[in-house]
Amino acid sequence: SSDLNGGEYTYSYDKAGRLKSMTSPLGYTKNFSYDKVDNVVKESDSLKSTTTYTYDKLHNMKSSTNALDGTTSFSYDKYGNLVKETDPLGRSNTYSYDLAGQMTSAADPLGKITAYTYDPAGNITEITKPGGRKTSYGYDKNYNVTSVTDPMGYVAKTVYDKDNRVTE
């Protein structure tokens, strides 16, 4: 592939077809290593930075560690939904889900909550940010987003043709 200046990226793959390395037009290289079930367990680059990853038995990432940033850890519920993410400084984001596995809330380390609401088809209909700022979404019968209302009340509308292509 090419960047915006026409520089070429090169990619190499292992025998299993997994990305082994990627090199940018400027020579920056990133290498990838995998475990026996295809999880990326290590990324290293030409700047001598290395990140390692661990996983649980369901292949959910448990931790991400590098020398510069430290370790970020992840916890999941029995359905595999991410419920807690803790950064190297011990700050945590927490997440809640409904029975359909849709995220209903996200709390930042300060306890500020963002809430999410869905229609029966699973489309997100509203995002409420801390302080009550709401963004609402409307859909047509084909589940295309037809309107977005921002916290200030501005409405952006989108119109689709019968083939679900944007016309306005």
PLM feature spans:
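Beta-strand elements of repeat-based all-beta scaffolds
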Residues: 2-3, 7-24, 28-45, 49-66, ...
